A protein has these predicted regions:
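Active-site-surrounding "flap" and adjacent substrate/cofactor-binding loops of secreted or lumenal enzymes
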Residues: 70, 94-100
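Positively charged n-region of N-terminal signal peptides that target proteins for export
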Residues: 1-4
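An alpha-helical repeat/solenoid feature that recognizes helix-turn-helix modules
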Residues: 26-41, 52, 56-89, 103-141, ...
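Sec/Tat signal peptide C-region and signal peptidase I cleavage site
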Residues: 20-26
Length: 398
């Protein structure tokens, strides 16, 4: 996040008691100017990709539709200082999103109700128009019903009503109480944050319970798959499916780890995008900087700092990683990162915003779109990855 002035004083959305702190500029003038130019090119390209008939983006001729993609684009557009809710592209995009409002309050077509609703809620929460505002509270209520808890909605796949001891507690899945994971929980928490919910809201506090069970550190996580682990980062889920509850799941496989008792064993591997998702949620939930969960996650981030790839997954989900990284570090409020090298020795401090702008500049095409480097999780879709990149850049220069 860029601010003018040599030592701007600003309120950081951070841990523990809220406080005011000075923050030096990390994004220098050269990278700021480059980022602004990249944003304008991306906006121009995305405008040209809007479906003339429906007003949506990445519209599937045969369906089902994914209004979340339009939600990402609209969110990226509306963050621009020169674009408001009356902009024709934004207005039509919002109309497309709201055309998928359901009687239950969700915003989705036939699939992925939690994912689509959450991302669309983040977008419409920024739109100062009565029709958008009217859809916010129903969407919040719908999302609440999908979080695994004592008060969850009875689902069609299996009941979502469980107590706090269940490994699914606090999580959110793709369907109506399908197996929860940190990716869906990440967009859920982002939506609740963007909609203005308090950090004390049960949505955040329940999310912390699920997160703790996916953090690979036995000082905070008592699940058997974390025994002896001191990675500090996050995995994907507490189960691969309903038949493996409590066994954990990582999209990054396993890693040989020196355990806390001095032995070595194979453990589920923490990786970049899920660690930044978890870290961001802890920030939004206002955990203290001294909380062991926060310190362990940030140490993982320092040991694995990179803008070359999604650490642990290579190029899989790389643009999604860039966005989660940007949002998490922006919320954390630090302009630099001091990576930890071998033996946890500090390395040279990095201006992460400059690093990420430079990396995205390498990946942007002349027409303003971004190069696909992988096809996993739909990252061969140029609209999707350009929206991810635009949101990251907008967050940096905001």
């Amino acid at each position: 996040m860029r601010h003018t002035g040599a030592a701007t004083i600003f309120a950081i959305a951070t841990f523990g008691a809220s406080f005011l702190a000075p923050r030096a500029l990390a994004l220098d003038d050269e990278h700021y100017a480059r980022a602004r130019g990249m944003i304008q090119k991306s906006v121009t390209w995305l405008r040209a990709q809007q479906d003339a008939k429906t007003g949506g983006w990445a519209v599937a001729p045969e369906g089902p539709q994914y209004p979340a993609i339009t939600g990402l684009v609209v969110n990226g557009l509306i963050m621009d200082r020169a674009i408001d809710a009356d902009d024709p592209a934004v207005k039509r995009g919002v109309e497309f999103i709201l055309s998928f409002k359901q009687a239950d309050g969700g915003i989705y077509d036939r699939v992925l109700p939690s994912y689509n609703t959450a991302i669309c809620l983040s977008a419409i929460s920024r739109i100062n128009r009565p029709e958008a505002a009217a859809a916010v509270e129903p969407a919040i209520a719908f999302l609440r019903s999908l979080q695994w808890s004592e008060q969850a909605l009875e689902g069609t796949e299996e009941t979502g009503r469980i107590d706090k001891d269940h490994p699914f507690y606090g999580g959110v899945g793709y369907g109506r109480h399908g197996r929860p994971d940190n990716s869906n929980l990440g967009v859920y928490v982002q939506a609740m944050h963007d909609a203005g919910l308090s950090c004390d809201d049960p949505a955040f506090q329940r999310a912390l319970v699920f997160l703790q069970r996916t953090q690979m550190d036995d000082r905070v996580n008592q699940m058997p798959y974390a025994k002896g682990s001191r990675q500090g980062g996050f995995i994907y889920a507490t189960a691969e499916n309903k038949d493996t509850i409590g066994q954990g799941q990582s999209m990054a496989g396993t890693v040989e780890e020196s355990l806390s008792d001095g032995t070595r064993a194979s453990r589920l591997r923490a990786y970049g995008s899920m660690t930044y998702n978890g870290f961001k949620t802890m920030i939004y939930a206002n955990l203290s900087r001294d909380d062991l969960r926060v310190k362990a996650a940030y140490d993982w981030i320092r040991r694995n700092y990179t803008v070359a790839e999604n650490p642990g997954l290579g190029t899989d989900g790389m643009y999604y990683y860039f966005l989660t990284m940007t949002r998490a570090l922006d919320a954390f409020g630090t302009p630099t990162i001091t990576p930890l090298g071998a033996g946890d020795a500090p390395a040279q401090s990095r201006d992460w915003e400059n690093d990420l702008v430079a990396r995205l500049a390498e990946l942007q095409n002349e027409d303003g779109s971004f190069k696909s480097v992988d096809d996993r999780w739909m990252e061969n879709n140029p609209v999707l990855i350009t929206a991810y990149a635009l949101l990251a850049l907008q967050t940096i220069v905001e």
